[in-house]
C-alpha cells in the first residue's frame, strides 16, 4: 500500500515518487498481486470514478504518458488506460519494460510503475548505477542489506521500508546528487545552501 500511495499521490507528479521497482524474481508474482489489491483498496475497481483519485496537470501530459506506455514493451499487468480529455491516467504497472524505452529513460511523473525483476542484489545495484543518480532511493527488506546497497549507490535521499517520508521532516536535508539536483535545503541545510559564506 505504501508503494502504491507513494507512486500515485498527486497522480505520480511528485519528484520523489518511485520511478520504478527492482524486485527479486522469487517475490515478484506475490508483489504484483499485492500492488493491484492496494490500488483497489484505495480507489475501488475503477479509479476513474473515485472522487479522490487525482488527475494529470493537463491533457498534454496525459498524452505524453500514453506515448510512453505505447512504446514501453513488457507486460501491462494492470491499468494502462489514458483519457487525455479527462487528464486521467489509471494506476498502471508494467512488468519488465524495455530498458531502452522512453518509459525507462525519462522521468515518468505519472501513476505508472515499471517493475523490473532481478535474481541477485548485485544486479539491482548494477541497474541503479547504470542510471542517473536518483533523488530518492527506497529499499524494502533487511536494513543491513539496504545499507550495503546505499554504500554502492549514490542518491539524494534514502528511506528504508517506506516511501516519500524522508521529505516530510523539515529537519532533514533534502536535495539531489548530479542529475537529480545539487545542494540541500530544509531547516539548517537551507541556510547553508542559500547563504554565501565569505572569508
Indicate residue ranges for each PLM-predicted region.
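Conserved C-terminal structural/oligomerization subdomain of aldehyde/semialdehyde dehydrogenase
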Residues: 88-199
Amino acid at each position: 500500500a505504501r508503494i502504491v500511495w507513494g507512486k500515485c499521490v498527486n497522480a505520480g507528479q511528485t519528484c520523489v515518487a518511485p520511478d520504478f521497482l527492482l524486485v527479486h524474481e522469487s517475490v515478484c508474482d506475490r508483489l504484483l498481486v499485492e500492488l493491484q489489491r492496494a490500488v483497489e483498496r484505495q480507489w475501488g475497481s475503477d479509479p476513474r470514478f473515485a472522487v479522490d483519485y487525482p488527475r494529470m496537470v493537463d491533457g498534454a501530459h496525459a498524452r505524453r504518458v500514453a506515448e510512453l506506455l505505447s512504446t514501453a514493451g513488457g507486460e501491462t499487468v494492470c491499468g494502462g488506460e489514458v483519457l487525455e480529455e479527462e487528464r486521467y491516467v489509471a494506476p498502471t504497472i508494467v512488468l519488465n519494460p524495455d530498458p531502452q524505452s522512453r518509459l525507462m529513460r525519462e522521468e515518468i511523473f505519472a501513476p505508472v510503475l515499471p517493475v523490473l525483476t532481478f535474481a541477485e542484489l548485485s544486479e539491482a545495484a548494477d541497474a541503479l548505477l547504470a542510471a542517473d543518480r536518483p533523488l530518492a532511493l527506497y529499499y524494502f527488506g533487511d536494513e543491513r542489506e539496504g545499507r550495503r546497497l546505499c554504500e554502492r549507490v549514490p542518491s539524494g535521499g534514502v528511506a528504508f521500508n517506506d516511501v516519500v517520508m524522508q521529505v516530510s521532516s523539515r529537519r532533514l536535508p533534502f536535495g539531489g546528487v548530479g542529475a537529480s539536483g545539487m545542494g540541500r535545503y530544509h531547516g539548517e541545510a537551507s541556510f547553508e545552501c542559500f547563504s554565501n559564506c565569505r572569508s
